[in-house]
Amino acid sequence: MVSYSLEKALRFTPLAQVDDNLKGKPGDTITYPKFTYIGDAKDVGEGQAIPLDKLGTKSASAKIKKAAKGTQITDEALLSANGEPLKESTRQLGLAIANKVDDDILEAIKKGTQRVTIEPTVEGIQKALDVFNDETEGTVVAVVSPANAAKIRMDALKNHAGSDTIANAMIRGTYFDVLGAQVVRSKKLGDTEALFVKSDVTSPAVKLIRKRDILVETDRDITKKITIMTADQHYTAYLYDDTKVVVATISESVGEG
């Protein structure tokens, strides 16, 4: 039941590639390679040697951690409650873990090295999209605060740009689409923050490594007549390809106070 609540509450997981390969295996640290591009091919004349480039690699590591939350309910609370405290505890435990996983995914994205300052306008969205240094196709999700989402949408309507009809939205509750970027409102970001993430199955922006699925345990303190319930999950979220991320600082539009 808690795992069901967790999956329903998770919102930003689609921005990450979920990897369950560590489940049931020893170790709490994952080391992964990061390859650098060898460059475009060049014209080679007849009889000339093909230039050989070395594939550049560097490694990074991420450590598995545990997110946990617990509740306790007295027998008096169970007997006198109008609702269903145990069911509500289950729901809230799933929500608590989901919020922590979402927070960690966003924190990983914030480590991106491609940075830009923009205004909350259609032009600002274009400026951020121009930072992506590749020409590969992929859905771009722009995560902004509710206030900035409203400003961008108003500017889009004024300039006859954008659409409220979104096909194949990556994130539940996507607000609207402008210049091909799916704008998502989130109170997890401040009014000076915006995150742009390009989807790529081959080289995702973020990876979410799950060591163990959510585990729920209950116990009784018979001396105090208390029911204890805990939930925890072992995982880590890390920035895998920062070329798929643009971290923007939002400033007020010219003329705004």
Can you say where each PLM-predicted feature lies in the sequence?
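Generic "edge-of-domain/loop-turn" microfeature
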Residues: Y37-G39, K69, L78, A149, ...
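Active-site-flanking structural segment that lines cofactor/substrate pockets
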Residues: V44-G47, P51-S59
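Charged, often Cys/His-bearing segments associated with DNA-binding zinc-finger transcription factors
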Residues: Q17
